[in-house]
């Protein structure tokens, strides 16, 4: 999906429900972090990435993603990770946020030539 001259890339409105698949380069985000803080920092960086990418302050991380981050221990986080970011409507009536972002882990064999892409949303 390359951009030709004069073509604009579509950005979704903040208030609509959308699902994207992205690759996060965790190694550069936990570089120069002490060993005992790497996995917790990786979770915080995923949260920050999702917040910036989707424009919602309420970010929820799936347990499979959390287990994958912690699978090699506290100090050896994966170098890259493929995630699916789903912006969803909040069912809770008294919540201050109308939308939240749900981050799930997407297993891939290789990270070569992967780009951010919109996915047809499927409610898991």
UniProtKB/Swiss-Prot annotation:
Instruction: Give the modified residues of type Phosphotyrosine.
Output: 102
Q: What is this protein called?
A: Large ribosomal subunit protein eL31
Keyword Phosphoprotein listed? The answer is: yes
Q: GO MF annotations for this entry?
A: structural constituent of ribosome
CDD domains in the record: Ribosomal_L31e (cd00463)
SMART domains xrefs: Ribosomal_L31e
Q: List the disulfide bonds.
A: none
SUPFAM superfamilies according to UniProt: Ribosomal protein L31e (SSF54575)
Report the domain of life of the source organism.
Answer: Eukaryota
Record-level GO cellular component terms: cytosolic large ribosomal subunit; cytosolic ribosome
**Pfam families (UniProt xref):** Ribosomal_L31e
Which family, according to UniProt? Answer: Belongs to the eukaryotic ribosomal protein eL31 family.
Gene field:
RpL31
Q: Keywords in UniProt for this one?
A: Phosphoprotein, Ribonucleoprotein, Ribosomal protein
Q: Does the keyword Phosphoprotein apply?
A: yes
InterPro entries in the cross-refs: Ribosomal_eL31 (IPR000054), Ribosomal_eL31_CS (IPR020052), Ribosomal_eL31_dom_sf (IPR023621)
Q: Which terms under GO biological process does the entry name? A: cytoplasmic translation
